Amino acid sequence: MLISVEVENFRSFYDRTVFSMETGSKLRSYSTTNTHRFKRLKLLKSAFVFGGNANGKTNVIKIFRLFKELLIQQIKTKSELDRLVTDTFGGNSEPTVFLIKFLKNNKVFTYELEYVEERVIKESLLVNERVIFSRNGDEIFLPDSLTPLRPTIRKNQLLLFFAQTNNILEAKEAYEWFVIDVVIPNTNKLHPTILKELKQNKELKRKLILFLQAADFNIVDIEIRDRTEQLPSEILLKSNDKNTELMIRDLIDQRFTELYCTHRGANEDTFVLSFSEE
């Protein structure tokens, strides 16, 4: 469960920016049913991010997508010539900084990473405020079982990946949280069940439009459209010494349901965008 994330020099976030799931002092309604308590922590079970277009809402999600990519990239990284994935503000070459706190298995994890394309500058993992590993330049602290392996650590190698590969429990738990527990839905598609319900339930559609208008998206209507497209039932690849042939079996009709939003422009004109274009 996410507690907070701090980011610096990532996409539209140049200065240190914090997104926290901890409850604020002004929370009054549903303070019991909509919060999760763990020791002194009071966390919101859900949160919405509001704002105009191009104000960085999606970039909050992309923090976690980048982390997944960074960790998966470590599997393929073989030498110090490989570059770490970055997405800095305006493409600058300054370090990117992340500090993420989360709750897993009744433990509070704090993971911090500062890095550039070529190397990791700082990195640490704390569990219930106990240091599991840390790095500050060339100074590296590891669990006793990994100390003999310290000379093998590359400058572009994440200690989180290194430690979980070598069966450090807390590192494995943190790695699992980033790679498995954090689920990022496909924002270009909605589940057919949701679209069907929106098409049939006029009251649900009305409430959704009001919600979108409250978020200041200038959406005045939504429409569910069905379309049919012919797709091959089977594709075969036939190859011999000289030629490779792509064979398509029978075409079948595949039905798709899509969401379209009608926007009102600055001059009171309207235009329609599909959900994938939003």
Spans of features found by a protein language model:
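A short, compositionally biased
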Residues: 1, 92-97, 116-121, 252-258
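Pre-Walker A-like glycine/lysine-rich segment at the N-terminus of P-loop NTPase domains
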Residues: 1-65
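Conserved P-loop NTP-binding catalytic core
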Residues: 37-48, 52, 61-111, 116-117
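Well-ordered beta-strand positions in beta-sheet-rich domains
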Residues: 16-20, 110-112, 272-274
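Electropositive, glycine-dotted interaction segments
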Residues: 110-236
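Conserved ABC ATPase signature
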Residues: 46-54, 238-278
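Short polybasic amphipathic segments
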Residues: 5, 98-100, 120-126, 257-265
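Glycine-centered tight beta-turn/hairpin loop motif at sheet-sheet or coil-to-beta transitions
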Residues: 12, 104-108, 266-268
